């Protein structure tokens, strides 16, 4: 049952990160693509914006995919946690803790869950379990 719980966590978080990466990279799911995301990154001081958007989008898309299928799970968790750490520092941190105030509550939750999965392991239903 634990492995099923870990699978559900990995799937929900991994697929969500993949979708956010696709928003940044391709403009899918209501996103703004590299140009729009890059412009916003520039506006918050993350320069060069297009390069930062590419790095963030790839981290979310690739990290999310790896996390969902449980392949190279510690690396995937690091990609997710790193993205959330930067989001906390650059965007949400100054707004305080609560998500209702655009704070870092949700980002911290995702960061801790990703790191926790890296520590616990991805479970039986993961590519890592087949290989390692």
Can you say where each PLM-predicted feature lies in the sequence?
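Extended, low-polarity transmembrane helix blocks
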Residues: 1-36, 42-43, 47-58, 62, ...
């Amino acid at each position: 049952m634990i492995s099923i719980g870990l699978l559900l966590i990995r799937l929900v978080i991994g697929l969500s990160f993949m979708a956010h990466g696709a928003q940044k990279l391709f403009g899918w799911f209501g996103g703004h693509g590299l140009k729009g995301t890059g412009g916003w990154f520039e506006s918050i001081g993350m320069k060069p914006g297009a390069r930062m958007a590419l790095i963030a989008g790839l981290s979310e898309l690739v990290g999310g995919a790896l996390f969902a299928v449980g392949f190279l799970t510690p690396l995937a968790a690091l990609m997710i946690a790193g993205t959330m750490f930067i989001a906390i520092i650059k965007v949400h941190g100054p707004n305080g803790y609560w998500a209702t105030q655009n704070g870092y509550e949700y980002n911290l939750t995702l960061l801790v869950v990703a790191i926790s999965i890296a520590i616990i392991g991805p479970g039986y239903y993961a590519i890592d379990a087949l290989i390692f």
